[in-house]
Regions:
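Short loop/turn motifs that connect adjacent beta-strands in outer-membrane beta-barrel proteins
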Residues: 53-54, 112-114, 171-172, 241-252, ...
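Transmembrane beta-barrel strands of outer-membrane/channel proteins
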Residues: 59-65, 117-123, 175-181, 250-258, ...
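Flexible glycine-rich, low-complexity coil/linker segments exposed to the extracellular/periplasmic environment
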Residues: 1-31, 194-222, 283-287, 385-417
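Outer-membrane beta-barrel signature, preferentially recognizing the C-terminal barrel domain
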Residues: 28, 32-41, 96, 125-184, ...
C-alpha cells in the first residue's frame, strides 16, 4: 500500500497485477539470462629430438578435457504476448563433457645451408559459441515457433598438414613456399528453419511433447559432411643491402595466400504431404548446397616497401583480401559475402638526439577503404539497378537459381552492411628506457 499511496502506478488495490504488460520488457530480458561455468584441463607430453646435425623432430600429444555447466530458462509464451513470464519459469541446468587427444608432429630438415624443408601435422578444435550450447528454449504458442540453443553441439575437429620449403640466400633474402590442407569434421553451422515432426520434440530436441509440429527458427548443428580446404602460401623477405649508396636501405616483404574449399551445407526444406488428406502432414526434406568455407577468403596479399637509414625507418604497406563468404542462409538470395578489400598504411619513425626518444607517425587506411557486405540477391527498386539484368536472368530458365545469382555483377547486389572507418593519423613521441 505504501507504493500505491506514494503514486507508483505499477501497484494498485486490484487483486492482480493489472499493469503486467508494462513489465513485458523485464520478463523478455529474463528469458535470455543465463549462468555458466567452464572447466578446462589440459595435459601434454612432448619430445624434441635432434637426429644428426640436419634433422629435428618435435612430437607430442595434448589431452584436453572440457566441462561446461550452464543454467538457462525454458518455457512457453502464450498467445498474449504480454504474458511472457511463462517463458522464464523453468531454470534448467545442463552439463557437457568432452575429451580430445590432439597429436602433433613437426619435422625440420636442413638439406643445405640455403635450403630447409619443414613438415607439420596437427589436430585442432573449433568450439561452439557459449550462447549456442545453453539449455535454452522459448516456445511461441502464437507463432508456433521455437527459439532454441543446442546443448548437443560438439567441437569441430580439423586435421591439418603443412609442407614448407625455405630458400635463404644472402642477396636473395628468404623465400618460403608452403602447401597446406585441412580436413574438418563437425563444422558448426546454422541450418535455418527446422520443422519438428510429430513424435520427435522430446527424442531429438529435448523439447516438451506439445512442441511437435512447431518450427525451430535458427537451428544450429554439426555439419555431417567432411570439409576439405587446401591452398598455398608464398612469403618473401629481403633487404637490398648490396645496392649502392642510399639504396641499400630499401626493404621489401611480400606474402600471398590462395585457398580453395568446398563445403556441403545441409539445407532442409519443409514439404507438405497431401496424400493423407487433411490435416496436412509436414516433412523435413534434407539436402545440401555447395559453397566455400564460411569466413574464409580465397586470396590474401600483403606487400610492404620500407626504408631504413641510420635512425630513420619507414614502411608503406598494402593489404588485399578477396571476397569472403560471411553468412549461410536457407534462401540463396540471402546468403552474404563481402566485397574485396584493399587498404594502405604508412608507418614512420625517427630517432632523436636524446637517448631512448623517437618521434613516430602512423597513418592507417590511407585510401579510406570501406567494408561492404552484400546479399547474393538484388534490390530491383534500387535507383542504380540495371533493369537489363532482370531480362538476362529471366531468359536463363535452364539454369539453377544459384547460377543465376552468380550472373549478377557484385555492384548490383543488395548491400546488407556498409562501414566507413576513414583514415586515422597518429603523431607522437615515444621514450624507451
Amino acid at each position: 500500500m505504501l507504493d500505491y499511496w506514494s503514486g507508483n502506478s505499477f501497484y494498485t488495490t486490484a487483486a492482480y497485477h493489472e499493469e503486467i504488460m508494462h513489465h513485458k520488457h523485464k520478463t523478455n530480458s529474463k528469458i535470455y539470462d543465463y549462468w555458466g561455468k567452464e572447466e578446462y584441463t589440459g595435459n601434454y607430453v612432448m619430445a624434441d629430438l635432434n637426429i644428426g646435425s640436419k634433422l629435428n623432430v618435435i612430437s607430442g600429444i595434448r589431452s584436453e578435457e572440457n566441462i561446461t555447466t550452464y543454467k538457462a530458462f525454458t518455457g512457453l509464451q502464450g498467445t498474449l504476448g504480454h504474458f511472457t513470464a511463462a517463458g522464464a519459469d523453468s531454470l534448467v541446468t545442463d552439463v557437457r563433457e568432452n575429451t580430445y587427444s590432439l597429436p602433433a608432429l613437426f619435422l625440420k630438415y636442413d638439406a643445405f645451408e640455403w635450403l630447409t624443408l619443414r613438415y607439420a601435422s596437427t589436430k585442432t578444435l573449433t568450439r561452439p559459441n557459449y550462447t549456442d550450447i545453453l539449455p535454452f528454449y522459448h516456445i511461441s504458442g502464437l507463432g508456433r515457433t521455437v527459439e532454441y540453443s543446442n546443448p548437443t553441439l560438439t567441437p569441430g575437429v580439423s586435421d591439418n598438414i603443412d609442407y614448407v620449403i625455405s630458400l635463404n640466400n644472402k642477396k636473395l633474402g628468404l623465400l618460403s613456399l608452403s602447401i597446406f590442407t585441412k580436413k574438418i569434421d563437425g563444422l558448426i553451422y546454422s541450418g535455418g528453419f527446422r520443422y519438428i515432426t510429430e513424435g520427435t520434440a522430446d527424442s531429438l530436441y529435448g523439447l516438451p511433447d506439445y512442441a511437435d509440429k512447431y518450427q525451430i527458427i535458427e537451428y544450429k548443428t554439426n555439419n555431417p559432411y567432411p570439409i576439405d580446404l587446401s591452398g598455398f602460401e608464398i612469403d618473401y623477405q629481403t633487404r637490398f643491402w648490396y645496392l649502392p649508396g642510399m639504396l641499400k636501405g630499401l626493404v621489401f616483404n611480400a606474402n600471398y595466400t590462395k585457398t580453395t574449399s568446398e563445403v556441403k551445407y545441409p539445407r532442409t526444406t519443409i514439404a507438405y504431404d497431401f496424400s493423407q488428406g487433411f490435416p496436412l502432414t509436414y516433412v523435413n526434406t534434407d539436402s545440401f548446397y555447395v559453397d566455400r568455407l564460411i569466413d574464409q577468403p580465397n586470396e590474401i596479399m600483403n606487400l610492404s616497401l620500407g626504408y631504413d637509414y641510420k635512425g630513420f625507418s619507414g614502411r608503406l604497406s598494402m593489404l588485399y583480401m578477396g571476397d569472403v563468404f560471411m553468412s549461410t542462409n536457407f534462401w540463396p538470395e540471402l546468403r552474404q559475402t563481402t566485397d574485396a578489400y584493399k587498404r594502405y598504411d604508412l608507418s614512420l619513425k625517427q630517432r632523436l638526439p636524446v637517448k631512448g626518444l623517437e618521434m613516430y607517425l602512423n597513418v592507417s587506411n590511407i585510401n579510406e577503404a570501406v567494408d561492404i557486405n552484400r546479399y547474393n540477391g538484388f534490390n530491383p527498386k534500387d535507383p542504380y539497378f540495371d533493369d537489363e539484368i532482370l531480362e538476362d536472368l529471366a531468359s536463363q530458365k535452364d539454369k539453377s537459381i544459384e547460377d543465376r545469382f552468380d550472373m549478377i555483377p557484385r555492384s548490383s547486389r543488395a548491400k546488407s552492411l556498409e562501414q566507413h572507418y576513414g583514415k586515422t593519423i597518429d603523431l607522437g613521441f615515444r621514450f624507451s628506457f
